[in-house]
Amino acid sequence: MSQVNMRDMLKAGVHFGHQTRYWNPKMGKYIFGARNKIHIINLEKTLPMFNEALTFVERLAQGKNKILFVGTKRSAGKIVAEEAARCGSPYVDHRWLGGMLTNYKTIRASIKRLRDLEVQAEDGTFAKLTKKEALMRTRDLEKLDRSLGGIKDMGGLPDALFVIDVDHERIAITEANKLGIPVIGVVDTNSSPEGVDYIIPGNDDAIRAIQLYMGSMADAVIRGRNNVAGGTEVFEEAAAPAAEA
């Protein structure tokens, strides 16, 4: 079973929240106190919630379900792409396009366009075009790959979302909520936990913290896939709301 420990979180700075003046009262129960006008997150609360989320992801992966990793801000994008690729999961690391979930039919058409352009780039079609047309298609390919490259192999809607910075990715969370897709999210002291089924109270800006979240989630996916019982066990349990006293 995937587990993270207190030492891992302390080393990564998971406990450092935002400046006290920017706090969201809905996160009050996860705050231990303040130091130099910075809120300190209570890791005694974070630890079981983080591990509960990891267990949920591991069981999803064991049932061959898809977890979509979402982290589009600068500090998260590269780590999200690398860790998602490591565990073979879909991801969005650049910009969330409105309707990525709720208008998936249109997104699927764009993915087909991306695949067609990839084939044309490889089979010599671009070389037969005028210089201007080839340049236009190359730019189109690069733009589509940047936006959709991480989900082109998703093959349908995901079974769960894992989000770094729930405020920054609020559109993604809203779309998932509309479709009943469970959301796992890192929620800092300045953010609202609304719409998040599995809350991980923690720093959502520090590179080391993001590496810990993403690395742990990727490990959970890998472990789950490696533990499929005869390839037939399917996890269909609905997400439980994350209510922590």
Swiss-Prot record:
Gene3D superfamilies, per database record: Glucose-6-phosphate isomerase like protein, domain 1 (3.40.50.10490), Helix hairpin bin (1.10.287.610)
GO molecular function: structural constituent of ribosome
Source superkingdom: Bacteria
Keywords: Ribonucleoprotein, Ribosomal protein
UniProt-listed Pfam families: Ribosomal_S2
GO process annotations (BP): translation
CC terms in the record's Gene Ontology section: cytosolic small ribosomal subunit
InterPro entries hit by this protein: Ribosomal_uS2 (IPR001865), Ribosomal_uS2_bac/mit/plastid (IPR005706), Ribosomal_uS2_CS (IPR018130), Ribosomal_uS2_flav_dom_sf (IPR023591)
Family: Belongs to the universal ribosomal protein uS2 family.
HAMAP family named in the record: Ribosomal_uS2_B (MF_00291_B)
Protein's UniProt name: Small ribosomal subunit protein uS2
Species name: Pseudomonas fluorescens (strain ATCC BAA-477 / NRRL B-23932 / Pf-5)
Gene assigned in the entry: rpsB
